[in-house]
Amino acid sequence: MTAAHGYTQQKDNYAKRLRRVEGQVRGIARMIEEDKYCIDVLTQISAVTSALRSVALNLLDEHLSHCVTRAVAEGGPGADGKLAEASAAIARLVRS
């Protein structure tokens, strides 16, 4: 049996937020098709970017407090792997 991910209790909330983002992205595509004003399109892109960043940061927080904490408590090579994995995820988020 595999262990539950840290976000499992919030899965419905994340799915709802991501469906909202999906709708926003479709709206942006429609704006482009309809030749909407550039700044209006950019404003919507900024909103989507912020929404995705919020989801990513919440997922990262749950990963750190659940998956990484559990691996560190258990010790061994799994802990080092989880720490390296978290560090790489943070680096990707900072670069984006």
Swiss-Prot record:
Keywords: Acetylation, Copper, Cytoplasm, DNA-binding, Metal-binding, Repressor, Transcription, Transcription regulation
Residues binding Cu cation: 38, 63, 67
Modified positions (N-acetylthreonine) in chain numbering: 2
GO biological process: negative regulation of DNA-templated transcription; response to copper ion
Induction: Negatively autoregulated. Induced by copper.
Cross-referenced Gene3D superfamilies: Metal-sensitive repressor, helix protomer
GO MF entries: DNA-binding transcription repressor activity; metal ion binding; transcription cis-regulatory region binding
Protein purpose: Under low copper conditions, represses the expression of lpqS, Rv2963, mymT, socA, socB, mmcO and its own expression. In the presence of copper, RicR dissociates from DNA, leading to the expression of the target genes. Members of the RicR regulon are important for copper resistance during infections and full virulence in a mouse model of infection.
Something else known: Constitutive repression of the RicR regulon by a 'copper-blind' RicR results in extreme copper sensitivity in vitro and attenuation of virulence in mice.
Family: Belongs to the CsoR family.
The protein's name: Copper-sensing transcriptional repressor RicR
Originating organism: Mycobacterium tuberculosis (strain ATCC 25618 / H37Rv)
